[in-house]
Amino acid sequence: MMNHTPLLLGIRERLIFALDVPSRTQALEWIDQLGDAISFYKIGMELLASGEYFQVLDDLASRGKRVFVDLKFFDIPATVAGVIRRLSQWPISYCTIHGWHAPMMQAATEANTSNMHLLAVTVLTSMTREDLAKMGINREPVDVVVERALAAHMAGMSGVIASGQEAAAIRRAVGSGFSIVCPGIRTNHVPHNDQQRTIGIKAAFANGADAIVVGRPIRMAQDPQAAAEAMQTEIMTALTEPST
């Protein structure tokens, strides 16, 4: 079942916390610590390796949190379709698939039998133009991102994962009714680490982002809950103040 309609998000669901931890114990500590400051959690590969991934998924759902399964599936269409078919049984809001192969995305959307929204990973925010060139792609990241966003849209995906730097170009190319979720968010005085194509919160939403994914700027903060609440306030301001 294609689920092209974007996920309708409450204003406090637009901040997604990257729960990049190695165990269920640490995951629960973060969920408890952040409390009402975070309503949407991304769970990825590190937690999968713990063997406790689906327990954490249930933990989040039982607390009324939205879940973003970020495992970036990339395989032959039949295999990816099988995974999506099984994941459709779980309370998942977002799930990622690499946006490199249109038939794979098409198979995934056709296999989706739930309200899970599929997002195509365009170009990782850790990659630069030079990284793409080393892979034989001699193009600007924004051009590759827009091309993959258009392919995802045609395949019936709900949206994409992309840097906020490219969100405006995606929105111009695809229009409304298509989710743009942006990682690589960095605030003042927070190191970029391995992120390259970064952007601030206000700029990401001004460019057309629907939601942002934040990990280290919250985890590394002296008071993570206060940092998350400050980001929620910044998001609310970005979404409600008149555009100039």
From Swiss-Prot:
<comment type="function">
    <text>Catalyzes the decarboxylation of orotidine 5'-monophosphate (OMP) to uridine 5'-monophosphate (UMP).</text>
</comment>
<dbReference type="GO" id="GO:0006207">
    <property type="term" value="P:'de novo' pyrimidine nucleobase biosynthetic process"/>
</dbReference>
<feature type="binding site">
    <location>
        <position position="186"/>
    </location>
    <ligand>
        <name>substrate</name>
    </ligand>
</feature>
<dbReference type="InterPro" id="IPR001754">
    <property type="entry name" value="OMPdeCOase_dom"/>
</dbReference>
<feature type="binding site">
    <location>
        <position position="216"/>
    </location>
    <ligand>
        <name>substrate</name>
    </ligand>
</feature>
<feature type="binding site">
    <location>
        <position position="125"/>
    </location>
    <ligand>
        <name>substrate</name>
    </ligand>
</feature>
<dbReference type="InterPro" id="IPR014732">
    <property type="entry name" value="OMPdecase"/>
</dbReference>
<keyword id="KW-0210">Decarboxylase</keyword>
<dbReference type="GO" id="GO:0005829">
    <property type="term" value="C:cytosol"/>
</dbReference>
<dbReference type="Pfam" id="PF00215">
    <property type="entry name" value="OMPdecase"/>
</dbReference>
<feature type="binding site">
    <location>
        <position position="42"/>
    </location>
    <ligand>
        <name>substrate</name>
    </ligand>
</feature>
<feature type="active site" description="Proton donor">
    <location>
        <position position="72"/>
    </location>
</feature>
<comment type="similarity">
    <text>Belongs to the OMP decarboxylase family. Type 1 subfamily.</text>
</comment>
<dbReference type="GO" id="GO:0044205">
    <property type="term" value="P:'de novo' UMP biosynthetic process"/>
</dbReference>
<dbReference type="GO" id="GO:0004590">
    <property type="term" value="F:orotidine-5'-phosphate decarboxylase activity"/>
</dbReference>
<keyword id="KW-0665">Pyrimidine biosynthesis</keyword>
<dbReference type="InterPro" id="IPR013785">
    <property type="entry name" value="Aldolase_TIM"/>
</dbReference>
<keyword id="KW-0456">Lyase</keyword>
<feature type="binding site">
    <location>
        <begin position="70"/>
        <end position="79"/>
    </location>
    <ligand>
        <name>substrate</name>
    </ligand>
</feature>
<dbReference type="InterPro" id="IPR018089">
    <property type="entry name" value="OMPdecase_AS"/>
</dbReference>
<dbReference type="InterPro" id="IPR047596">
    <property type="entry name" value="OMPdecase_bac"/>
</dbReference>
<feature type="binding site">
    <location>
        <position position="195"/>
    </location>
    <ligand>
        <name>substrate</name>
    </ligand>
</feature>
<feature type="binding site">
    <location>
        <position position="215"/>
    </location>
    <ligand>
        <name>substrate</name>
    </ligand>
</feature>
<comment type="pathway">
    <text>Pyrimidine metabolism; UMP biosynthesis via de novo pathway; UMP from orotate: step 2/2.</text>
</comment>
<feature type="binding site">
    <location>
        <position position="20"/>
    </location>
    <ligand>
        <name>substrate</name>
    </ligand>
</feature>
<comment type="subunit">
    <text>Homodimer.</text>
</comment>
<protein>
    <recommendedName>
        <fullName>Orotidine 5'-phosphate decarboxylase</fullName>
        <ecNumber>4.1.1.23</ecNumber>
    </recommendedName>
</protein>
<dbReference type="InterPro" id="IPR011060">
    <property type="entry name" value="RibuloseP-bd_barrel"/>
</dbReference>
